[in-house]
Amino acid sequence: MSKSWNHDRAAKHIDQKIADVEEITIKDYVRDMSLESIPTSTAYRVDGVHMYADIMNLEDMLNITAVEGTECHKRTLRFLDQHYRAVKRILNKVDARRVDFHSQRLHSLFTKPYNTESGAETKRVQRAVATAQLIIDVLAETGDDDEQIPAAKVRIGIDTGLALAVNNGRSGYREPLFLGDPANHAAKLASNNKARGIYLTNNARKAIGLAESDEPEKSALTAIEIKACQDAAKLDVTSDEIVEEWREDLKKNPIGGYQFSRQTPPLRDMDIYSLTPANSKRQEMVSLYADIDGFTAYVADHINEKTDDVVRTLHVIRSELERVVTSDFEGRRVRFIGDCVQALSCDGTAHTTDEEKSVSEATRLAGALRSSFNLAIERLNAEGIETGDLGLAIGFDLGPIAVTRLGAKGNRVRCAIGRSVIESEKRQCACSGVETAIGQVAYDAASKAVQNLFGKSRKTSHLDYNEATEALADDGDASAKQARSEAYAGSAAIIRADERQVQPHSRQKVDGSR
């Protein structure tokens, strides 16, 4: 049987998820509340400072050799592992929370001092700035010349304000996920430019008495401004102490050699939580990012009213997108990053990847994700749930990808790295909420039908499941022809894409305007 999306199957799952979040509780986060294992039906308004640290030379590590081979990936994973361990040690010392470590980006949160203390926001921002400089100083010392691991080049973004905390996992792996302006703006500041340094939004600048900037992304804090924050924060740790403890920890808990094996498709059977450096996966596969476009503004608009609808919308859409990836197309979700899903897919055998088929199926997967997204919006609105003006931006690419977990035993984080991972995210970021984009490597490996669908721009609009399957099948794509043949054999009521009106649930134009 080929992989397929089915309207009735999707509708049934969406309706069940809507029923699961009928009752929602919104709480204000206060002293001593736990953010661990937040129930699906609960969300917290959290007033805090969000910091994103972007390791800017990850891409250089992945391109250190002409061919993206195993040694390139081993060296890159060791690079990330060493720096992750150092940053985690810093956050523990300064009483900040690690939210996520996604490839080159580390997201952390400062909630202390609480708002019951005078000048709490100012003190939180000062503490975040002092910590940011500590991270920069430590990561300048945590390379390894013997292993050809360079020091990390870091750019840091900081914002302050209210965010919405919900759960970010399944089963026993629930961690808080933070939605809204502060996390989003901090992330954009960290990744918005090639210049290193510490960058604050105007909200964060005002909190510590600095003048607003017309271009915050180009206004790095000066040494004097950083020193003022360090003096005010009075962190009880120095970079020399962190580096010394980090080196001792590496001796006691060495990273070990990375060993790769292939994951026999389907990738949904990959147990990421069992992976270690000695048991890592690596093969040619498709990396895909699907981002709910407009969600940050939607959260900001509803942070104080109809917040329960935000929680319902997120959980329903996110759950359905994951179902499409894992159940309909037998792929593997790596993680949720805010309102974005990161996934992997692969077709082939235990020994080889069928690259052309993998790209064809990824194209139809992208279409299925949009069909489920549109259907979820439709069903949510039918229940009177306010969903704002949301879209879905999708990007994917093909290439060698290594999947493992970083960190010491008992404190590991998932990681999927490869040039295609970076490129697929770039392609997604270049899309509006109605667009799907394909990377150059995937395009080159694709069938002629897929290339015709995306065109020279390698981007297309309003691509849903029916359109993707019909267009590819009509143009001779073998995977799509098989899927259509099986669908027609199972039902005489299949609606051809050219016979139905596409009604996207985003008012965005292709160029991103409204």
Swiss-Prot record:
The UniProt record lists the keyword Protein biosynthesis: no
Binding site for Ca(2+): 291-292, 339
Gene3D superfamilies the UniProt entry points to: Nucleotide cyclase
Protein name: Uridylate cyclase
Species in which this protein is naturally found: Pseudomonas aeruginosa
GO MF term set: adenylate cyclase activity; metal ion binding; nucleotide binding
Family, similarity comment: Belongs to the adenylyl cyclase class-4/guanylyl cyclase family. Pyrimidine cyclase subfamily.
UniProt: Mn(2+) binding residues: 291
Domain Guanylate cyclase: 49-190, 286-428
Region called Disordered, residue ranges: 495-514
Enzyme Commission number(s) from the entry: 4.6.1.26
